Amino acid sequence: MLTDMNISSRASLKNITELGADLGLLPEEMMLFGHTKAKVELSVLQRLAGQRKGKLIIVTAVTPTPHGEGKTVTSIGLTQSLNAIGQKACACIRQPSMGPVFGVKGGAAGGGYAQVVPMQEMNLHLTGDIHAVSSAHNLGAAAIAARLFHEARLGKKEFEAQSGQAFLAIDPNEIRWHRVVDHNDRCLRQIHVGLGDNNGPEYESSFDITAASELMAILALSHDLADMRARIGRLVLALNTQGQVITADDLGVAGAMTAIMADAIKPTLMQTLNGSPCLIHSGPFANIAHGNSSIIADDIALRLADFVVTEGGFGSDMGFEKFCNIKVRQSGQAPAAAVLVTTLKALKANSGLATEVDSNVSNIHVPNINATNINAPDQARLEAGFANLNWHINNVARYGIPVVVAINRFATDSDAELQWLMEAVNASAAFGCEISDAFSQGEAGAIALAQTVVRAAETESQFKLLYPDEVSLEAKLSTLAEVGYGAAGVSLSIEAKQQAQQLTALGYGHLPLCMAKTPLSISHDPSLKGVPKDFVVPVRELVLHAGAGFITALVGNVMTMPGLGLKPGYLKIDIDAKGEIVGLG
């Protein structure tokens, strides 16, 4: 079979203006970037304010493995197949970060005959939104550092006299706004700034990957430009010497940060291999952020299409949980149905029968199954791994959403094992189960899946949140740990307990939680496979994201700045003699 790059490069593409017109966009509602992509103006929301909305489908997966489950392949394939059976469908997915592209995971445009094209344009830069987020974020960091420098240099009286600004009395030990870059770079996890003469007070700082920036979450959760401006103004950049918050509005930098992101708030329109529309917007990770594409993209697509297919990052304990408890809480747009992606490989890998350390991913345990024997029939391992799938089925169902299981077929899969798995799923709480061949067959490979999803979406969804706003932060943590993960309980560090009290006292106790934990286990420990039991979730820190509207709980050893492994993806990427990019995939 051809590589993803080969398939993408051979694709016959619609002109982007034709694609937009087919979706229902007017020429003036598209800001063109060549012939293959365009930003969508938010004025379309005003024009279609009274339009009946379509149905939202959320795609999630079992606990992820290094073998890949094909969630984006399924999202794109389902969108293509919905259009093929006469439904008007649009996909809404996140913009890939270049960190994973050059790291282990690779691109995020789908694959095979179910991908967004041109895939190299999607995976590298796109229309520059991530760069805009990085620049706006780092302007905030530069502004707080400069203010600290000038206030320390001049003192209160002289600073106010010379600058005409209020003295903020920034506590250098309480600067909460650090810097970001869109690469995996572990050496930037802990740094000192202000070293040397005349460079400002020295303080400890760090870099996060841009996908973890609160601005990325704001981009994904804003309803319009005015909402984004208000949210950026609420960003907590530091505390003063009295323990009070200093916001981006207090610093006077919120307007400039918003200006940098003024075009980034517009989703980017691209197409799949069969000419189905796809809106790409925002890129928060699901392990260290809320892991879903934007509310704005969904809102535009829902006013133009019968079905909108979106996805949450990683497994249902990660992106799907945050889709429900953060995104839907803020958007008010509940899904009509969910698709849960699995593979035979994933279930065997999640069987918990053996593990080893993957040499390419530091501190991540993966199944001790090489590429040869994981493809071989192994009924015992498959049955043991089914417990993980069944847990995810029940996890989705607890939100009142009908769930359709999609088995992403590989060429090496055993027909007997596929048949056993379908029978096992049909005996579970799932609405239905279908095998998807979208990777190898494109739109023709997911027709049955599309038909079953349509039937599931016609049932009455009884969506419900996992917890209400008004309960305490400690109660929310307990609910997420015990109900959301099946834990025996939750333990807070001394620092986390103090932060919970402080956040409540400052008036932020009503906010939802964003759990930052490993995606490689339902628990906090990546070595615990299958369906872990009798574990306690350790919360080491609570981080306020007042602009985004949630509080992040850092669990276990999760990092907000990834590192590159022994065999990073950039080793394969180059330019050929024709000037074409090669090695992406």
From Swiss-Prot:
Keywords annotated in UniProt: ATP-binding, Ligase, Nucleotide-binding, One-carbon metabolism
InterPro entries membership: Formate_THF_ligase, Formate_THF_ligase_CS, P-loop_NTPase
GO biological process, one term: tetrahydrofolate interconversion
Binding-site positions, ATP: 65-72
Species the sequence originates in: Shewanella baltica (strain OS185)
Top-level taxon of origin: Bacteria
EC number annotated for this UniProt entry: 6.3.4.3
Ribosomal protein among keywords: no
Keyword ATP-binding: yes
Catalysis: reaction(s): (6S)-5,6,7,8-tetrahydrofolate + formate + ATP = (6R)-10-formyltetrahydrofolate + ADP + phosphate
Protein name, entry field: Formate--tetrahydrofolate ligase
